[in-house]
């Protein structure tokens, strides 16, 4: 028997399946109409009704540690021979961006510290340009004066790539936040690099489209930073990476040259595809100032299922069944272990809507036919329940319920940040070995680690491995590295699936790339930024 049709007369509905149901029971018998709110939550908004990412400055970091150690005091890094900003420099930059040269120490404190509060620079200057020409003038001046520049968007990165290491000038794109054009037939959006991802999502959704990427940090991250790090996120399974959806870029090179490759064409087979050099380059080759991106049509029907699985083998089999049965409507398949759910409950007060399980999966479908999607989803759920792959679950289709269920996955990073110091690893691994490292590390680290958790994007083989401790520990770091990277290399995996390398991971690039590739990367850097002023100390290994 198929699942009941999902029709508008069911406002804010939630369906649950219980493991106590007998084998062979129909899907209808395994469902019940959910309550208006999940136990453990407040009113209709409460902990669920807000954006998943807590704005900068309002997370619990201040209650954990009032001061973050300066990066050079924690890491063995030496300042390169760049010039120091002088009063004459400040006067010259003030003429370029009048009233937008920030030197106040209080205003400079947040952009000097990363969101995870693990690295801290000592920049004395932040610039806020509004236009590409202002960025060009800034970089031209800094190139002539040999002043290092740290491009910065929403500063939501995980690897220290968006914060200065020493006293680099911070070039913020926060005021470059205008939509330049949108074509409502092709779905091509052209915008400045400082547009916040969530604001762009709202803009295109009002016009019947969606952004091809979605991140837990969408309330703060900038599209320019997303492109500069080739951010993956929650929709890669359906829409692919930004290397496929970004059509064109406008980039300012280190010497102030404006490279305008801001095409809106889906097909352009003329010469080298230069935009690919800057996608994922983390601001080391040029400053992205504008983006042309292809937005897919907004689905008229979205469903989210949150399911409990008895083991990781069942998670993999559920994914295999999901791809086979849901096919063209499958848009996301996320997984998380029980430790993740415990931390979300402990630090954020969010209740798990299903019975406790060793693993949980979140599945999103998106399509244009409510009846068609409901029928396919019903068949899938009946299959995984009857086969024992899934022991319990809940399903939502209205916007509020969907946000509630997604918050359980999207706010894991926030929960981890409240648990102590976090050692974060963003790995690509073969699916059948995706979770093995988590159990391996629990045995290896023992009580020296507070928590070892694993979650991520199963659809594209991306594991987010996180280890927490009360405070930073060199002995714990020594037990983790290089062991994690050697283990990953042994599986022919990648040491960075989507977060990039930034400052904290730059020296492990060799675990994923051969020496010949590293040499070519250095040559490209020297060609486009001969003085090395753009985001120094990032991405490329310190030593050749």
Curated annotation (Swiss-Prot):
Sequence positions that bind (R)-malate: 409, 413, 424, 499
Residues with N6-succinyllysine modification: 124
Alphabetical list of InterPro entries matching this protein: FAD-bd_oxidored_4_C, FAD-bd_PCMH, FAD-bd_PCMH-like_sf, FAD-bd_PCMH_sub1, FAD-bd_PCMH_sub2, FAD-linked_Oxase-like_C, FAD-oxidored/transferase_4, Oxid_FAD_bind_N
Binding sites annotated in the UniProt record for (R)-2-hydroxyglutarate: 409, 413, 424, 466, 499
Reactions accelerated catalytically: (R)-2-hydroxyglutarate + A = 2-oxoglutarate + AH2; (R)-malate + A = oxaloacetate + AH2
Targeting presequence: 1-10
Tree of life domain: Eukaryota
Keywords in alphabetical order: FAD, Flavoprotein, Metal-binding, Mitochondrion, Oxidoreductase, Transit peptide, Zinc
One BP term from GO: malate metabolic process
Top-level taxonomy: Eukaryota, Metazoa, Chordata, Craniata, Vertebrata
Main localization of the protein described in the UniProt heading: mitochondrion
Organism: Bos taurus (Bovine)
Name recorded for this polypeptide: D-2-hydroxyglutarate dehydrogenase, mitochondrial
Mechanisms controlling activity: Activated by zinc and cobalt ions.
Role noted for this protein: Catalyzes the oxidation of D-2-hydroxyglutarate (D-2-HG) to alpha-ketoglutarate. Also catalyzes the oxidation of other D-2-hydroxyacids, such as D-malate (D-MAL) and D-lactate (D-LAC). Exhibits high activities towards D-2-HG and D-MAL but a very weak activity towards D-LAC.
SUPFAM superfamilies membership: FAD-binding/transporter-associated domain-like (SSF56176), FAD-linked oxidases, C-terminal domain (SSF55103)
EC number per UniProt: 1.1.99.39
Residues involved in (R)-lactate binding: 409, 499
MF (Gene Ontology): (R)-2-hydroxyglutarate dehydrogenase activity; FAD binding; zinc ion binding
A matching Pfam family: FAD-oxidase_C
Domain FAD-binding PCMH-type: 119-298
Similarity remark: Belongs to the FAD-binding oxidoreductase/transferase type 4 family.
Residues that coordinate or bind Zn(2+): 457, 464, 498
Group of enzyme by EC: oxidoreductase
The gene coding this protein: D2HGDH
